[in-house]
Amino acid sequence: MLKLFLIFIFISNIIFADGIEQKVKEIIKNQFGNNVQIDFKKYKIPPDLKREIENKAKQKFFSENVIIWLIKEKDSLLAVAIMDNVYGKAQPITFITFLDENGKILSNHIVKYREEHGGAVANFNWNKQFIGKDEKSNFNKVDAISGATISVNSINKGVYKLVLLYKTLMRTEAWK
């Protein structure tokens, strides 16, 4: 038990280094207000599901884990947010996708952009194009950004992966 606790603390420190946890909480409060309950957990993606989603999205997951945030108000689920990383040109890009209970995207945010170029993918207006998309949407039509081709493609495929993951998770209670 102590070993599991220490592993959780170690992984949490890695994931939430550089103020990432605080930035996510700030994004949640800005979107849903101050009166929401926020719970998060690390979710290990089962290998078969991971492979299936990676093949469909044509992009590998950054790791075998994602962080799932449950945003509730008075025990009513408002949204589920899934945080992951994708590779930019040379550095990871940390992003979070908010979904409603039906799997439609409510919003997408870049939590941490580490590259020297291509930071325009963090622009709120660019990320608005994901709102309303679900697993049946055409993710091939996203706005290009000059100088950010790799980041645009990575974020686009990454968001699609999380939508596919959530659609599968909706059918099970194991992740909650």
Label the model's feature ranges:
Residues L2-F5, N13-T94, E101-K176:
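Intrinsically disordered terminal and processing segments
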